[in-house]
């Protein structure tokens, strides 16, 4: 029987407790997004821990492609227009700052991976991503409750493939996969807390907030694009051989198809559900 991570269990319990506060504050959309994110990462982690020594590269490409395509489209359609609508210049600066902040955090995060900490580095990076994404989701939905669920669900869709990959690595390293309960709950923990905050009613501030959210999510989505290269994540997790150039060429077609389909799915949902 695999070990149960205490810090992972604490993360889950924190989400349960905060969910009670969210229900009393009528943060229904934030609560739904929080638990969808938890179910996506925890469920995919359970599958990843049982996947054995190899992972089917094509399935991995499609999982990342669908999620990143949906996320890029959602941020571009639902957040960018809101940011520019509040204030064109400040909204634009917010988008730029969000992308640059995402890049900076990702780059510095790789440096922190070399530190000696009593916590799995991959799980630590996932937790940081989840807490940041949750805080932004909470701010956006807490101050713009008329937004539909489609944006939030598309944004957290990448939690599934991320949890699958992380669990596969932890399982191969002989570490408890249950530590991923913390990043799985992380989105909800910070989303519920930040949704209780009220952003001052100012077009400039709202432009920066929504622009920053769009920029961060665009960076994260582009980071999850399925890059089929030697030494890349698909190559590493699927344990392809060094002479797998032909397979990687085939996977590039699937990468383009999956990201395109992810965007098309969001467009179809917007046409059929989000439109009055």
How should each PLM-predicted stretch be described?
Residues 1-276:
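Intrinsically disordered, metal-sensing/regulatory segments
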């Amino acid at each position: 029987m695999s070990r149960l991570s205490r810090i992972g269990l604490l993360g889950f319990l924190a989400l349960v407790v905060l969910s009670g506060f969210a229900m009393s504050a009528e943060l229904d959309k934030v609560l739904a997004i929080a638990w969808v994110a938890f179910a996506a990462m925890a469920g995919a982690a359970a599958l990843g821990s049982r996947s054995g020594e190899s992972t089917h590269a094509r399935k991995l490409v499609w999982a990342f492609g669908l999620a990143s395509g949906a996320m890029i489209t959602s941020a571009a359609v639902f957040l960018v227009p809101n940011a520019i609508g509040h204030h064109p210049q400040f909204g634009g600066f917010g988008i730029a700052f969000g992308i640059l902040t995402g890049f900076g955090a990702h780059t510095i995060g790789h440096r922190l991976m070399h530190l000696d900490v009593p916590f799995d580095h991959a799980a630590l990076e996932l937790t940081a991503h989840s807490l940041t994404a949750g805080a932004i989701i909470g701010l956006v939905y807490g101050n713009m409750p008329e937004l539909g669920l489609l944006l939030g669900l598309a944004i957290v869709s990448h939690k599934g493939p991320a949890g699958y990959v992380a669990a596969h690595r932890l399982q191969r390293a002989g570490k408890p996969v249950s530590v991923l309960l913390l990043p799985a709950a992380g989105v909800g923990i910070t989303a519920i807390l930040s949704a209780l905050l009220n952003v001052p009613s100012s077009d400039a501030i709202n432009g920066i907030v929504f622009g920053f959210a769009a920029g961060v999510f665009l960076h994260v989505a582009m980071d999850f694009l399925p890059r089929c290269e030697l030494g890349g994540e698909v190559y590493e997790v699927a344990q392809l051989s060094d002479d797998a150039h032909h397979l990687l060429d085939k996977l590039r077609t699937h990468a383009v198809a999956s990201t395109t389909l992810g965007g098309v799915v969001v467009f179809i949902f917007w046409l059929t559900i989000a439109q009055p």
